[in-house]
Amino acid sequence: MNSLQVLTKKVLIETKAFSKYHEDDIFILQQLGLWWEIGPIGFCKQCKMVTGGSMSCSDVDSYELDRALVKAVKENQTDLIKIFVSWGAEINFGIMCAKTKQTKDLCIQLGADPEFLDVGLYNMFVYLIKQKKVLLAIDIYYDNISILDSFDSHDFHVLIDFVYNRFILYLDEKEEEMTRNTLVLKFWYKFAIDFKLTKPIRYLSKKFPHLDIWRLQTAIYLGNIDEVHHAYFQEDIRLSLNVMMFLACARPGNKLGIYYCFALGADLDRALERLISFNSINRKISGETRLCIEGSYLSNVYFCIGLGANPYTKKIQETIKQKHSNIMILLFSKKKILSPHSVLQNKILDPSDVRKMISTYENTESFYPFFSLAVKLIQQAK
């Protein structure tokens, strides 16, 4: 049963009784636990969002109810913990962040599973992935060393690899130098960029500005051109255009990322040279796996040529010969299917217009004869 004090706070928060306050009231509100970040705490029953001061539910700094609970648990705010649980917050999220025995015991009293920390951590991580709860996951795991250490090394890296290969996580620092704390932060940050979760991205970019370059790199690699546009033009974050293009080409089928780097001014011939140097046709891979790899690789080669890259430069021809790839030599001899595509020749930087153009291109492209020929040549080379 909640105390009169808790019930009173609950009513005051729900009615936003302190939406108008005097500066002299701030200290009192803080001492009473009625202050949230930048102003008196408020709660929207419809959106299930906890706010501070005049912020709206859509504000980047507003909190979903479960996140608000985690924050209250970390700060040992007993009354707020009770209030948030009464509104429907999941108490097991709270027990994962309890720093004191008293707060942990309170979580158990409010319904948390005493064995959750022993048996529920793995499933909770997977649940947060499925629900795309990026900010909640970061609130729970980041700087929560006791929780991170409770995963053995194998389980932890299985979780990190659950959705991704880890290539992009180590772009800006060596694997052996990265702490679990940083790795889990970048895992969820990358997740937000991959699924284009705008609010989490904006929140994290504000909180972790030291990852700005990495954020741009990740957006390029994943083809999130909305985020590339935002970082490049609204935040003035810069990378070498050719480095950006190499990142875009490193992901198979990344038409959006490749096109956007081209539109910004990256050198297409250098990109094609890099792609050719990555050629894996001569590797000993058999069956459908080999064809899948080659198809993905060739799609980027073909797209760069469609944008205007010249496959007949001396350097590219020399690279093909050095790779001893008869298949690439034969493919590049088919000049009728290796030419710029008319749909792709305009340089457009508005993300929505780029998507429309790429969609039009995909409905008209002639990649399939090229790919069919490649498959035929690969099969003949076996």
Swiss-Prot record:
InterPro entries attached to this UniProt entry: ASFV_MGF360 (IPR002595)
GO terms, biological process: taxis
Domain of life assignment: Viruses
Similarity remark: Belongs to the asfivirus MGF 360 family.
Function noted in UniProt: Plays a role in virus cell tropism, and may be required for efficient virus replication in macrophages.
Protein's UniProt name: Protein MGF 360-4L
